[in-house]
Amino acid sequence: MKKIFDVLNVIKQKLFVKKDKIHSEKYYRRIDFLNKYSLLFHAIIAMAIVFIVEIISRRSFISACKFVDAHTLAFMYNSFLVFVSFSLVYLFRRRAFARVIITGFWTILGIINGCVLSNRVTPFGYTDLKCIPELLAMNNTSYFTAQQATIVVVGLGAFALFLVALFIKGPKYTGKIRYAGVSVAFLALLFVAIPVTTNVAQNTNVVASYYSNIAQGYDDYGFVYSFSSTVVDRGMKKPEDYNKQNVEYVEQKVNSQKQTTTVDGKTGPNIICVLLESFCDPDEINFLKVNEDPIPTFHELEKNYSSGYLNVPVVGAGTANTEFEMLTGLSMQYFGTGEYPYKTILKQTDCESIASDLSKIGYATHVVHNNGGNFYSRTNAFSKMGFDTFTSKELMNITEYTPNGSWPTDDILVSETMKTFDATPDQSDFTYIITVGTHGDYPKEPVIENPTYTVSGVEDEGMKNAWTYYVNQLNEADRFIKELTDELSKRDEDTIVVMFGDHLPTMGLQNSDMKSGDIYKTKYITWNNMGLPKEDADLYAYQLLAKTTDTVGIHEGTIMNYHQTQMNSTDEASYQDGLDLLQYDILYGKRYCYNGTDLYPASDLVMGIDKVDITNVSDSSTGDTVYIYGHNFTNWSKVYINDSKVASTYLSAGVLAIKKEDISDGDEITVCQVGSSDTIFRKSENAYTYVDPAVEHDSESETDNQ
């Protein structure tokens, strides 16, 4: 033990104890030379950092070289941005320390992007930082493993220790820092030059101001510029022609063409919208061959009911953005690079959606999703969009998981959907279902023994295993579709269902791999029991529900009516300009289209359909455990004693257990459904007063809970 302490003491002395050292004249001449030509060295270091970051992002030295060759000016512009950041060192005496921090900053961002791209197609952007707390709170998923967490913590810890040592023992600039002089003026000039040079670079097509394909944009214009644009380019730009007169002109054009709604919340059909996570028809992939059709139900519905391609805004990840377009009718192309509106504008602004439109005519509106309620800030977003209820996994009694153990199976969503219908017997329902069963990561090692569906056309063994896993999970999704439509067929209620893939799976697919020629195209299918004619059409995600409601005689809402009347216009530019104008007006403008009022306020979202209650509490025979009995408990049910959470064990949907030492006679017990970050989604309908059998009570106190 003494030897260990001696070694640690030596390390401490070497790294963290400052000792005066007399340097040679040659050392000081070298330092003077570096200071004199520091701008040149900064330029060289900046280019080196950008090149290294591109190697990490592309995971290929050759690809990084091709980027420099094919997009030399973009590479130089990325280097300029890093060079400007290095100019900050002139404000400090510990310039070596400042240079290491700046170098570490860009390198760490590049490493994170490389890690992200190893698991999905969409590169790392600023908005992803807002998802980190939710990712860290999610256990047993491919988003963030314990191994990744350990590597991140150890790596950042080591870097922090190195910075401390450098701060203590590193060199310090001894010359005069002219804070109010030339240095500060030079720094100001450099930073002022950024928007000017950016504008020039965009106007000369050195870089782009908008990425129709964010993954391709990062490839073409570099990580540093692209990530920086996600930081500063958020929200919507105000259209040049935005004013009350132009908004009213668009509204008048729509009003002159729109039809009248012919149903209401009692006579209208139930509408179900199903997001099929990462769903892709294997027949659409040119190289992939499957031994037999894994999605026969999907293909049968595609053949007999309205269907088509669906243009979505993301590939490989970003479910929330496809969801946003589909529910609101608004387009992601007008937002900043890589932005998630759920994490930005919808944090403070309510937003018209299909839910609020249908609520106006008496529909009950629901969301059912077997993943965490807080992920993508969905609980907040669904409230802002006007939904009545949201049943997330915390409100479900989930027992079955996918073969890789990461995600709940989707079969539970059928019964949970039926609950939404049964809860409102006198109303028509709009229920939005979000599946997760086909979610990545797709294991590159064999996971399923003797899989029913096997693939060929894939040479790499790891990718062959991944595709095998994926197509077998597609079959599970297909079974879910059949179970859902079969169950709906049993009900004597008019119903229409629309199902769609939110994006292609994270499998590195390219445009050339797809029969459609576009990795931003998925498919949608429909089902109905109303005898509606088959009308195939290729749509954008933001047009899907406008088209669906149009077929059943529902013509409600500013945006939905806009699409219903204008989406078939031969003037595509005018159609997009009008959408841009209305979208800005609703989210960022003065809401001229609502006459300046808040027509669609946020709802008081109720989490779950089933009520949670406590029916009895009793001690175990051993006296060391207390059992809480009730209804509709889940794995996310937590016991609170006098409003403070205590450790509890889930035993069944009707029984929870706590330690006897955590409760005292007369304490008040409640059961809460708890999400990530200890968010309480729902409390038990009643509180229960604990009566300790070891304490004498009068008869009145013993009957308080009856």
Give the location of each predicted region.
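Solvent-exposed soluble domains appended to multi-pass membrane proteins
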Residues: 259-265, 273-276, 281-706
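Serine-centered coil/turn micro-motif
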Residues: 14-15, 25, 222, 353, ...
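Short, well-ordered coil↔helix boundary/capping segments
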Residues: 99-102, 126-129, 221-226, 468-478, ...
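Membrane-interface segments at or immediately adjacent to transmembrane helices
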Residues: 194-273
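Transmembrane and membrane-interface helices of multi-pass
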Residues: 2-217, 666
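Alpha-helix initiation and N-capping motif
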Residues: 129-132, 220-224, 247, 295, ...
